[in-house]
Amino acid sequence: DGIAAEIIYPTVGMLICNHPDFDYKKACFEAYNRWLYEYCSEAPERLFGMAQVSMRTPADGVAELKAAHAMGFKGIMMPGDPAVEDYDSKVYDPVWATAVELNLPLSFHILTGRSGAIDSKPRGPRINGFLSIIRGCQDIMGTLIFGGVFDRHPNLKIVCVEADAGWVPHYMYRMDHAYNRHRYWMK
């Protein structure tokens, strides 16, 4: 087929991203990461797995990033919703700093956050729900940008997966509009 390499994202792990029990989620992701490590070790020059982390606490997140890096993973799939505060909080600065230090891109996938979650009920016809599945990635990007995360960590690499890209120019326009007109009262 002419495929030279593959980046492997979890499927079932997307559902577990929204599980409310962070201890359960952490155990599932640790087991998945061990399995994925073994699977990718058959052809490490061609198979690149994305480790999953639970982000139960920022300290756990740092440890999970370090463990994934030690296993040779080249990127991390993050849950859309952490357990402690939100991703713009400075309590996550050690996580972002660790990702930069280890050169690990952090990936946010559609359907893994509260906005556009896989189990959310769409408004109107079911097909309308398909239009909203990118919302979680939009929310993450707005949170990181307006929250100053990229100002504090300019070398942080973030990937939005299966969220298309057509929304980006309009979203940038909306962000500029919000900032220019509403930044003083919408902090």
Model regions: which residues?
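Acidic active-site catalytic centers that drive phospho-/nucleotidyl reactions
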Residues: 2, 33, 109
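Catalytic pocket-lining loop regions of alpha/beta-barrel enzymes
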Residues: 27, 41-48, 53, 58-187
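Active-site-proximal gating segment of KS-fold condensing enzymes and close homologs
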Residues: 23-39
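Divalent metal-dependent hydrolysis catalytic cores, especially in the metallo-beta-lactamase
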Residues: 1-22, 46-52, 74-78
